């Protein structure tokens, strides 16, 4: 167990390596691809131009690993508030980040994601991934209206914000608030659902938002074929189905 800025961290080995932060599961070797592939590929497989990417959180390296598969990415800024997460992941969870940590396009910044976004110039990033833990003292602002507005400001006109948007079961109110907030700020937003067995209730969500019409259904098919071969979970059919899985109780809440 290690103490860090945001709490106590533990790497568990007995039933497959996993990372726990203050009693909450963050990731595991067994389940992480359910999460990381769903966060990254719906956004990046729809982009065919040179792009700058920002990852807020993501200290385990999984989001970076999926991003570096795309040749059109010019730059990746990883902004992680807790350096210990990166150190622990590199030492004990090497299988997640792997060689992606050494990619020349990657720059690691130990910094507060909210402050980083505020000091970034307009229209700088083409894709922003919010790969953060559940709302807490240290991450609440990453779910706020003001933060999402700042993300919109620093995105290019056709840029995409991709965020984990919690469980519609275990964190229903937070989930609905995220969806309503993004819908209010961006022209379009779409949410997909899938399984992440290690997380509360086992069902999770990811939301994608843009100021232009999202092209998530208009993928670069050559890119899709190449990326699908390297994925364990994600493929285009999986994605298309996952975007149609919104529980009816969530639909009713959003329409009310």
Model-derived regions, located:
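Single conserved hydrophobic/aromatic residue that forms the stacking wall/gate
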Residues: 1-7, 11-12
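SAM/dcSAM-binding transferase cores
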Residues: 8, 180, 201-256
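A general beta-strand register signal
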Residues: 20-21
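The AdoMet/dcAdoMet-binding core of the Class I SAM-like
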Residues: 31-160, 169-174
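C-terminal substrate-binding/active-site "lid" region of AdoMet-derived donor-dependent transferases
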Residues: 139-141, 145-213
């Amino acid at each position: 167990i290690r103490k860090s800025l945001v709490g106590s961290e533990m790497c568990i080995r007995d039933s497959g390596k996993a990372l726990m932060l203050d009693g909450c599961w963050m990731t595991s070797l067994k389940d992480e691809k359910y999460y990381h592939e769903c966060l990254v590929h719906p956004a990046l497989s729809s982009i065919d131009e040179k792009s700058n990417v920002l990852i807020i959180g993501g200290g385990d390296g999984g989001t970076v690993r999926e991003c570096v598969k795309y040749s059109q990415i010019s730059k990746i800024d990883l902004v992680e508030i807790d350096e210990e997460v990166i150190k622990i992941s590199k030492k004990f969870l090497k299988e997640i980040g792997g060689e992606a940590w050494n990619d020349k396009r990657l720059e690691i910044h130990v910094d507060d994601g909210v402050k980083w976004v505020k000091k970034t110039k307009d229209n700088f990033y083409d894709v922003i991934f919010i790969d953060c833990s559940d709302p807490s003292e240290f991450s609440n602002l990453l779910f706020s209206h003001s933060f999402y507005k700042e993300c919109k400001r620093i995105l290019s006109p056709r840029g995409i914000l991709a965020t984990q948007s919690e469980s519609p079961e275990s964190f229903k109110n937070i989930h609905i608030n995220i969806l309503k907030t993004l819908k209010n700020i961006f022209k379009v937003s779409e949410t997909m659902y899938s399984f992440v067995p290690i997380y509360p209730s086992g069902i999770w969500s990811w939301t994608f938002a843009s100021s232009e019409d999202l092209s998530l259904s208009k993928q670069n098919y050559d890119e899709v074929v190449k990326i699908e071969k390297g994925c364990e979970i994600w493929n285009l059919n999986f994605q298309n189905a996952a975007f149609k899985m919104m529980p009816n109780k969530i639909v009713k809440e959003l329409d009310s």
